[in-house]
């Protein structure tokens, strides 16, 4: 699903994704990928937070804003300055191809072809997605563009916290013990999705 994203929106996104020294966190290749695969128009969910076109971007930006605020307020130390930007903005990168508009009917053309009619107000899971998963998938997709630190990998992998599968709760706890920013990432995600509702 290619994105229709205005020049001013691209500029705003790129400016937001800059470190205090002006270094861009997002390469041109990464930006092309985000545009081509629908990051800016995808929803964040089918029926919960951010379940509208552009919801993934809004949710991801809010998580990043919360994570940056938590970092400053709590004097969090990250291995790399870019980490809260990458973790916050791309923790749900897995969702770029995870949802689609459901087909509600078809229009038969004169030549016998059928054109689907989509419900543009609703979302459903896309069964055609080849790469499944959540945190793991986001890490795999990001690895095409970044050499991620162990801390970034764990923060993205376990950002769901206790909402992850019960069989992984011990792993989540161990990840938090080794990389405390995993817990802060989960908190930023919960603030965005459950408090702000984005």
Regions found by a protein language model. Give the residues of each.
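Non-catalytic interface/linker regions that flank or bridge core catalytic/transmembrane domains
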Residues: 1-42
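All-alpha helical catalytic cores of prenyl diphosphate-utilizing isoprenoid enzymes
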Residues: 29-36, 49-61
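Divalent metal-dependent catalytic cores for phosphoryl transfer on phosphate-bearing substrates
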Residues: 45-47, 52, 58, 70-198
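Helix-hairpin-helix/helix-loop-helix acidic hairpins
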Residues: 64-65
